[in-house]
């Protein structure tokens, strides 16, 4: 809607000689704004640039901006900032804890892998008329697991691609497999996805090896 209303097109062009912020310690001053309904987190490296943007919004009058401090939560994701290294990390532990409580699995045992290599979802019998209650519960759990997989636990992506094939014809057995993935999440919910600063000294990639589990 903002694009249709010409909001961004009406922003004034800053002359070249006025684009340098003396207070900015970086070669290029940057302001990144993620627009999502009324939650618009900003990431910037120059306070003057942010203040100029706030002045523009106030002058324009159509959008109000309010500072609420450092980003800690957004759309169910918890963020952490390391002021020393500049690294940013995130996790969804509170969401996983809530899911465990929702499905009565708070005290369940954990698993090292989200789905056993010997599991064969395709061999499970599919009823002609699936139980609507089971299908609804299954679809709800899988949808919640998908959101976690997309944002902070990408290693369960393949398992989710298997589970989503039965969204409208799931049985109790399928539901049990989905809860098995939740058991796995309980064991890894303290892990975080981290984006390191550009000058990180020890860049590496970590991967899961489940074949021998």
Regions found by a protein language model. Give the residues of each.
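Glycine- and Gly-Pro-enriched alpha-helical subdomains that act as flexible
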Residues: 1-21
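Generic low-polarity alpha-helical segments
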Residues: 2, 16, 42, 54-57, ...
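Intrinsically disordered, low-complexity segments enriched in polar/charged residues with Gly/Pro
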Residues: 2-5, 28, 66, 76, ...
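Polymerase palm active-site segment centered on the conserved acidic dipeptide of motif C
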Residues: 5-12, 41-103, 182, 186-194
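Divalent metal-binding acidic/histidine catalytic loops
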Residues: 20-33, 38, 85-87, 91, ...
């Amino acid at each position: 809607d903002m694009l249709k209303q010409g909001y961004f097109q009406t922003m004034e062009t800053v002359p070249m000689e006025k684009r340098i912020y003396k207070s900015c310690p970086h070669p290029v001053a940057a302001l990144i704004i993620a627009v999502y309904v009324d939650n618009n987190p900003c990431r910037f490296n120059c306070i003057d640039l942010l203040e100029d943007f706030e002045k523009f919004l106030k002058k324009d009058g159509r959008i109000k901006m309010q500072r609420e401090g450092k980003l800690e939560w957004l759309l169910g994701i918890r963020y952490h900032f390391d002021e020393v290294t500049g690294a940013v990390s995130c996790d969804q532990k509170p969401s996983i804890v809530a899911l465990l409580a929702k499905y009565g699995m708070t005290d369940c045992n954990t698993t090292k892998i989200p789905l056993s290599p010997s599991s064969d979802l395709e061999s499970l019998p599919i009823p002609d008329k699936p139980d609507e209650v089971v299908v609804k519960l299954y679809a709800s759990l899988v949808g919640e697991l998908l959101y976690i997989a997309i944002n902070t636990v990408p290693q369960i992506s393949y398992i989710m691609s298997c589970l989503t094939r039965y969204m409208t014809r799931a049985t109790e057995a399928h539901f049990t497999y989905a809860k098995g993935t939740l058991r796995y999440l309980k064991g890894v919910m303290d892990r975080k996805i981290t984006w390191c600063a550009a000058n990180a000294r020890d860049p590496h990639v970590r991967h899961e090896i489940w074949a021998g589990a």
